[in-house]
Each structure stands twice: as structure tokens, then as C-alpha cells.
């Protein structure tokens, strides 16, 4: 349905939002063909970013702050907040909706009280912030109502990360039991093409069960997100002018 959105996480992340049968050209997204049949074409707005799990790998491999990716959740939960520390993960510039190609990654807010947990939490939060800031922008600029948000890929193992997204967007997340839904979807449509499935209704027989992440009232993370956006605007976006 229009407004249905899927976030795929891996080294980077991909966000696709169903925009219905009207093709839209948007400077902050790619427009792709999500589905086609004899009756209609369904289009999607798509956002690509090179760093999601890649940010966690950087914390592990380059900074040696964690021993394994799962530690990012464990250490983040040890602190009540990020202690005012923020990571702008512009390892290959800042993508949509900022578009600052020459931006470089940086920590902000480090003080004498900063510890490893704060740095790791700032890194993990920054991945969620990148996704949420894009979706918020698209909701506002395109008047899109996010009715159904699914997240799959390697980072769905991190429940702290998923809760951040759910809280910030104030929306329930659907987490499929199958981690790689992109490949599974390609398989289903391949089956349909070769007439093993007669129509889209038959696809319901192959639906994957979902778990849910429910938003909770957490004003602190919204305040943190606002501070992150202010840093991006002050030190990266306005510097382009």
C-alpha cells in the first residue's frame, strides 16, 4: 500500500517507500519501479546510504571500542544517555536530505567524563538518526503517511537500535523472522512469473511472521535527536553557504 516503507540494513542501509502508481521525481531520493503487472506500475522512493553496520564495524575494527557488533547494544544500555556525545557518521559525506559531499565524520561533545560506552552509544544512535531524519523529511516534503514500517537485515538483532527508530518516528516496527527479505521477495516474484503462483493473493500463503517493536514515551532520545540535527545544521549544512 502507499506509504508502506522497508528499511534494509547491512553495511549500509536502503529505504524504500511505496508512493503508489504515480511516478515522482525527487531530488532527495531515487525513484524506482517497485512492482509491475499487466494492470499497473507501483513506484517507490529510495534512499541509499553507505554506512549503517559499517559504522559499528568502524567502532570495532578502527577504534577497538567493541569486540563484536553485539557489544554496541550491551554498552549502549549501560548508560542512561549519550552524555552529550554525538557522532556525525559522514565517512563518505552526508547523504539525503543534507547532501554535503565533502563532509567528514566527527565526534562532538567529548569531555573528561566521556567513556567508551558513550562513544559507542553515540555511534549506534547516529545510524538510527540518519534513517529517521530522511524519513521525517520525506513525510513532510511529500506528505507521506508511513502506515507500515518494516526493518530487516543484519542490524535487526540490535533491539536497542530498533527501539530508537520506533520511539523517534512514533510508529510500530515490523521485524520479519527472516533476516533477508529482499532476496525472499525476489524469490516469490520469480515464482509468480513462472506461474507457480497464479496471482498476488497467492503470495499471502508465503507471508513471513513478524515480531513487533512498540514505541514508548522517551523524551530524552527525541531531545538527543534534536541536538544531533542542530550539530549537522550548524557545522555541515550552513558551512556550505
Residue ranges and their predicted role:
Residues 13:
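Active-site PLP attachment segment
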Residues 5-7, 150:
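Conserved beta-strand elements of the Class I
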Residues 17-241:
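Glycine/Thr-rich phosphate-binding loops that ligate phosphate moieties of nucleotide
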Residues 1-4, 17:
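Conserved phosphate-binding catalytic cores of ATP/NTP-utilizing and phosphoryl-transfer enzymes
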